[in-house]
């Protein structure tokens, strides 16, 4: 009969790794997505860890050489565990917001 009381040794259990273990990795992921979708006018600036959802919150700003961080355009959320985007605007939404911010500058 099998002994059901035995627990596996902790040494044999793999330690899961986080896809985005720190703020810098979240910034790089959002930056790469922004460059691919929009270009280099948008900058992933402020980054916060949201404990309740175990996610990174990254603020995206319109930024130029003459006027850095002109306008906040979006908030992006990424799962720290998987690296998946949990919430982000579409390319069209970002383009519209960027056009509006450019006109106001």
Segments and roles (model prediction):
Residues 1-105:
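Long, terminal "pre-/pro-" and other extracytoplasmic accessory regions
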């Amino acid at each position: 009969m099998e002994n059901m009381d035995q627990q596996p040794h902790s040494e044999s259990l793999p330690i899961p790794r986080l896809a985005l273990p720190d703020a810098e990795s979240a910034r790089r992921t959002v930056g790469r997505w922004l460059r691919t979708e929009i270009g280099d006018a948008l900058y992933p600036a402020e980054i916060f860890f949201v404990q309740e959802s175990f996610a990174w919150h990254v603020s995206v700003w319109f930024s130029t050489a003459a006027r850095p961080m002109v306008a906040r355009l979006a908030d992006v959320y990424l799962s720290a565990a998987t690296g998946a985007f949990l919430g982000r605007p579409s390319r069209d939404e970002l383009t519209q917001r960027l056009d509006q911010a450019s006109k106001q500058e």
